[in-house]
Amino acid sequence: MAEEYSWDSYLNDRLLATNQVSGAGLASEEDGVVYACVAQGEESDPNFDKWSLFYKEDYDIEVEDENGTKTTKTINEGQTILVVFNEGYAPDGVWLGGTKYQFINIERDLEFEGYNFDVATCAKLKGGLHLVKVPGGNILVVLYDEEKEQDRGNSKIAALTFAKELAESSQ
């Protein structure tokens, strides 16, 4: 009996192994929650948990409006991902693993080697992420880390190459 090839293995072999990304995951298009992920860990940290980069239970943050009034807002990370695709922007950013990523842009029907994808790009200090709607009701989440000599452009190409593979396999 052949060993089952898991999403984690597939993400690792096709994305993480390129060294163009520091992490990759798949989220459901229904709720935006990441259900499979891989990440480059710190070799010096035996307690590294890849999930800490991709998921955190709902939590509250304090936000300040233009008048300086502080209020509490509950963050549901999956919903912050869905807002990007449903609304075309994310005024409160995209949150993943408790980290806020500033929304940069969304490209609808971006053509890549014969396939079209909706692609969103978000940034944080010295890194960022790409969100790509892929066939099968999934959203590909790709992280890049400039401190690991990764950049927005090359990580986006790696994400789109993987998205193309998924599109080809779903035909």
From Swiss-Prot:
It is found in: Cytoplasm, Cytoskeleton. Its main location: cytoplasm. The record marks Y89 as: Interaction with actin. A motif (Plasmodium-specific profilin mini-domain) lies at residues 48-54. GO terms for cellular component: actin cytoskeleton; cytoplasm. Residues 5-10 are annotated as: Pro-rich sequence-binding. Signal peptide: none annotated. Gene3D superfamilies: Dynein light chain 2a, cytoplasmic (3.30.450.30). GO terms for molecular function: actin binding; actin monomer binding; phospholipid binding. The record marks Y35 as: Interaction with Pro-rich sequence. Residues 100-112, 152-156 are annotated as: Actin-binding. One of its GO terms (biological process) is cytoplasmic actin-based contraction involved in cell motility. Keywords: Actin-binding, Cytoplasm, Cytoskeleton, Lipid-binding. Belongs to the profilin family. Essential for the invasive blood stages of the parasite. Binds to proline rich sequences in various regulatory formin-like proteins and also to membrane phospholipids. Binds to actin and affects the structure of the cytoskeleton. Weakly sequesters actin monomers. The actin binding residues are poorly conserved between Plasmodium and other organisms. The Plasmodium-specific profilin mini-domain may have a role in binding to membrane phospholipids. Binds actin. This is Profilin.
